[in-house]
């Protein structure tokens, strides 16, 4: 199997080491569409990350959870990242998965453009994704298609924009702390 290349970034070379090769090989057997679904595979700082095309996320998630040889039955966390310089792939969502059965840990990473920030929801695959998808929507603006109640969870319902994005204005709201006022970040002293 040839490893796909994305924007000049090749996959990490095989062998990956540890159980990573076994997971990658088992996944390739369990999911025949893997070469189409995976953009690249990275091993960095002791973490195995599969970069998944968003249209294959749900299928791959079901295989990772349900295949007896893999059994990634727990979604530990789901988080968003905004890379404004990664044109056409500005929004990333990272899924941390654990196999309690085999004591293994992997990550999935899915990217979407600002112009079309839709990624399939995995709430019905891993219920722990529920509030985490809502938080990622609230903070980054990623729309999780199929989520049963994609509403704001941290910010007020009428809050404009998504405050964790790097293009979000730093304005701020003046805060009073023990009688002293803290100005918004835009009005604070600049340090060179």
Curated annotation (Swiss-Prot):
EC number(s) on file: 7.1.1.-
Subcellular location(s) of the protein: Cell membrane
Family to which this protein belongs: Belongs to the complex I 30 kDa subunit family.
NCBIfam families assigned: NuoC_fam, PRK07785.1
Pfam families xrefs: Complex1_30kDa
UniProt keyword list: Cell membrane, Membrane, NAD, Quinone, Translocase, Transport
Organism: Acidothermus cellulolyticus (strain ATCC 43068 / DSM 8971 / 11B)
Family annotation (HAMAP family): NDH1_NuoC
Uppermost EC category: translocase
Bilayer disposition of the protein: Peripheral membrane protein
Stretch forming the signal peptide: none
A molecular-function term among this protein's GO annotations: NADH dehydrogenase (ubiquinone) activity
This protein's GO CC annotations: plasma membrane
UniProt-recorded name of the protein: NADH-quinone oxidoreductase subunit C
Predominant cellular place of this UniProt entry's protein: membrane
Region (Disordered): 170-192
Summary of the function given for this chain in its UniProt record: NDH-1 shuttles electrons from NADH, via FMN and iron-sulfur (Fe-S) centers, to quinones in the respiratory chain. The immediate electron acceptor for the enzyme in this species is believed to be a menaquinone. Couples the redox reaction to proton translocation (for every two electrons transferred, four hydrogen ions are translocated across the cytoplasmic membrane), and thus conserves the redox energy in a proton gradient.
Membrane-spanning segments: none
InterPro entries assigned to the protein according to its UniProt record, in alphabetical order: NADH_DH_suC (IPR010218), NADH_quin_OxRdtase_su_C/D-like (IPR037232), NADH_UbQ_OxRdtase_30kDa_su (IPR001268)
Subunit structure of this chain's protein: NDH-1 is composed of 14 different subunits. Subunits NuoB, C, D, E, F, and G constitute the peripheral sector of the complex.
Catalytic activity: a quinone + NADH + 5 H(+)(in) = a quinol + NAD(+) + 4 H(+)(out)
